[in-house]
């Protein structure tokens, strides 16, 4: 596959590398510098979604469980009526009900409170859950906390035998909160090739090397657009009926089921929307 047109533009957007697979075969790749593990920022959220999927599959988590039950020991004295209605599913859709985003990157170093679970649940729930899309790190963070509590281990330890080891991803680094819990909303460090394998895993609907590891039903449910917003369970939806893990500065693995393809790239781009449009036009359109 000829991606020379994209490579010319890629330099304008500080793209560090791109990998493209079609029909499970490598179609093209390009790097502006050697591969290394990088912070994939909010693309981490899609790995948290995957962890929730395994936990649901193992009977550890029920998406319909109320947050007041799941976090009964962390609730404020006065429980918001909208919080009473929120479920585990609402943690995954960016429709939790809070008015604005919290636990965001620039905020986290400034918090005096170390218990981010209790801090997250005391934030007012202005909207009825499921009615307003507000990009917010609280949902994926709490989802990750719940997986850790129910499984008894951090997210790296939980995903290693279930996902990472099978994909050949050796013990990655993952940011933690002040109490040592994996931060489910960001801070996972991977190479481009490792991120690309994750995309291939989802393209193949939870299969790896011919073996079904994660339920195909979960893959389909978690990557379709929800009723509110262009978003699944911690996956963005996009053109060509695609879905993607998407992190700050354009750390992306895009899955295109109808084209049987995966396009992954890492960058230091401050113009993410423009870069994404360029990928659609100069890469996806040629697949």
Task: Go through each PLM region and give its residues.
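A short, well-structured edge-of-sheet supersecondary motif
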Residues: 4-34, 63, 253-254, 260-264
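Catalytic-site signature segments of enzymes, centered on catalytic residues
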Residues: 27-34, 104-186
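Active-site Gly/Thr loop motif
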Residues: 218-264
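Active-site helix/loop module of the DD-peptidase/beta-lactamase fold
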Residues: 60-98, 122, 151-190
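Active-site SXXK
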Residues: 24, 39-64, 91, 143-147, ...
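Structured C-terminal helix/loop/strand segments within mature extracytoplasmic catalytic/sensor domains
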Residues: 22, 247-287
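Solvent-exposed loop and edge beta-strand segments that line ligand/cofactor-binding
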Residues: 36, 40, 79-82, 128-135, ...
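Active-site-proximal alpha-helical segments within enzyme catalytic domains
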Residues: 142-146, 184-207, 251-267
């Amino acid at each position: 596959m000829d991606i020379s047109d994209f490579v010319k533009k890629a330099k304008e957007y500080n793209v560090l590398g791109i990998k493209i697979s079609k029909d499970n075969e490598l179609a093209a790749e390009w790097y502006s510098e050697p591969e290394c593990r990088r912070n994939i920022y909010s693309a981490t959220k899609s790995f948290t979604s995957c962890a929730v999927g395994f936990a649901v599959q193992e009977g550890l988590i029920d998406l319909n469980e109320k947050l007041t039950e799941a976090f009964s020991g962390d609730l404020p004295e006065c429980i918001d009526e909208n919080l009473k209605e929120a479920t585990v599913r609402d943690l995954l859709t960016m429709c939790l009900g809070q008015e604005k985003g919290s636990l965001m990157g620039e905020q986290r170093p400034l918090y005096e409170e170390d218990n981010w679970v209790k801090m997250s649940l005391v934030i007012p729930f202005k909207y009825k859950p499921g009615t307003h899309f507000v990009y917010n790190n609280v949902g994926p963070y709490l989802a990750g906390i719940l997986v850790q509590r129910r499984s008894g281990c951090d997210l790296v330890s939980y995903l290693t035998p279930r996902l990472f080891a099978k994909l050949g991803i050796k013990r990655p680094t993952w940011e933690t909160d002040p109490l040592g819990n994996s931060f489910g909303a960001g801070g996972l460090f991977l190479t481009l090739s490792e991120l690309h394998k994750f995309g291939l895993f989802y393209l193949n609907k939870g299969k790896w090397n011919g073996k079904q590891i994660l339920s195909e039903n979960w893959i389909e449910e978690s990557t379709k657009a929800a009723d509110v917003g262009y978003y699944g369970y911690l996956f963005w939806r996009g053109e060509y009926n695609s879905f993607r893990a998407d992190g700050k500065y354009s750390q992306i693995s895009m899955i295109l089921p109808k084209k049987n393809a995966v396009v992954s790239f890492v960058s230091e781009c401050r113009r993410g929307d423009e870069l994404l449009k360029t990928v659609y036009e100069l890469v996806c359109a040629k697949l």
